[in-house]
From Swiss-Prot:
Gene transcribed to yield this protein: pdxK
Function: Phosphorylates B6 vitamers; functions in a salvage pathway. Uses pyridoxal, pyridoxine, and pyridoxamine as substrates.
Any GO BP annotation: thiamine biosynthetic process
GO CC aspect terms: cytosol
Gene Ontology molecular function terms on file: ATP binding; hydroxymethylpyrimidine kinase activity; metal ion binding; phosphomethylpyrimidine kinase activity; pyridoxal kinase activity
SUPFAM superfamilies: Ribokinase-like (SSF53613)
Annotated family: Belongs to the ThiD family.
Spans traversing the lipid bilayer: none
Taxonomy, superkingdom: Bacteria
Source organism per UniProt: Treponema pallidum (strain Nichols)
Protein name: Putative pyridoxine kinase
InterPro entries given in the database record: HMP/HMP-P_kinase_dom (IPR004399), PM/HMP-P_kinase-1 (IPR013749), Ribokinase-like (IPR029056)
Phylogenetic placement of the source organism: Bacteria, Pseudomonadati, Spirochaetota, Spirochaetia, Spirochaetales
Amino acid sequence: MVKLLSIGGSDASGGAGIEADLKTFQEYGAFGVATLTAIVTMDPSRNWSHRVHSLEEDCVRDQLETAFAGVGVSAVKSGMLASVHAIECVAEYLERFAVAAYVFDPVMVCKGSGDALHRELNELMIQKLLPRATVVTPNLFETAQIAGISVPRTVDEMKEGARLIHERGASHVFVKGGGRLPGCKHALDVFYDGKTFHLVEDELVQSGWNHGAGCTVSAAITAGLGRGLTAYDAILSAKRFVTTGLRHGFQVNQWVGTGNLSKWRDRFH
């Protein structure tokens, strides 16, 4: 059995974060384990605004100790790391257990909170985790933060961001554009392996029920790597997986909706 570890925030709505990751791992026929670094809630009395409740260092460390015990972990993904101790713990355990496949989803802002994480946390993530990443999966805002450029608005700017991020240490870079580029009629992302740029395109699903799509694609990439796929093939599989889920998306509450991940069955089953 392939064992996968997701490290990140729990989303009380169930659509994103650890909850999305574990659903994704299950769809790939893998056994998912989790380490929570924070819990994200939504307040319906305040227009569904989000709050991030970080967990203490001992709690994070004890979970990592449990997750890595016993049967070896095939691949690891990290998402929301909203504290210095969470970032440092993840870096420590990646090194201690010589993790060969690591997907770094550099969550720098929580949708609905309106606030980016503290700049010093972003810099610490880049310093400690980016050089360890088999694949890093920034969105356009995160690409700008890591690469030190303006938010990309064209494919060429996405490529430049990917190149600069690769220079900072990541083995492979997957810049998630989705449908956010001006005039874009497809869900378009850029993959860079240090030598070649690949455009990864699929249908742009306009339902609006896309909460957790970024978490899901990085989790699916993690599952693909854990299954032995190359980084590029894992990304192609993840793209199909997410698009299929979004086609069958549904409303979770008055604020968000999410993709129906059960509508897709990968060839690994």
